[in-house]
A protein has these predicted regions:
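Two-component/phosphorelay signaling modules centered on CheY-like receiver
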Residues: 14-33
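Acidic catalytic/metal-coordinating carboxylates
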Residues: 37-40, 63-66
């Protein structure tokens, strides 16, 4: 899969969703769905099957870690990028263990968030190429024995 063309933003803060939407537009993502909580995130993911999900950890009612686990169980091939203000190593490790592809700090300067998202999208595209048997690096495979 090339870089994502649509996305689902899951964050309970409307101004954060607007900011992420603007950054995604700068990266060429025009179709964006939004969810203010975990239940809505699951509904939106089921309805739209987005190319990528951007998920906050601090959500009302159902926490982001539980939402991440449910999203990955229901849609294991949809990449999830955590976009959170939490920056503890424990949280980062937990999200990676649950299947998140990347972790972006939302309170970093906008230019850094934009670069982190761009890098994450590139990594997702490269990972999909590897899953499809496409090239991941310039190193040739060793000859078959």
């Amino acid at each position: 899969m090339p870089r994502p063309v649509n996305a689902l933003i899951v964050d309970d803060e409307p101004h954060v969703r607007v900011l992420i939407r603007v950054l995604l537009k700068q990266l060429g993502i025009e179709t964006v769905w939004e969810a203010p909580d975990g239940a809505a995130a699951l509904d939106q993911a089921n309805a739209h099957k987005p190319d990528v999900i951007l998920l906050d950890i601090n959500l009302p009612q159902v926490g982001g870690l539980e939402v991440l686990a449910k999203l990955k169980a229901a849609h294991p091939k949809i990449p999830v990028i955590i976009v959170s203000s939490q920056s503890t190593m424990k949280t980062v490790i937990q999200t990676r263990e649950l299947g998140a592809e990347a972790y972006v700090l939302k309170h970093a300067p906008k230019s850094e968030v934009l670069q982190m998202l761009s890098d994450a999208f590139d990594n997702i595209a490269e990972g999909d190429a590897a899953d499809a048997g496409g090239p991941v690096s310039e190193t040739p495979a060793p000859p078959a024995a």
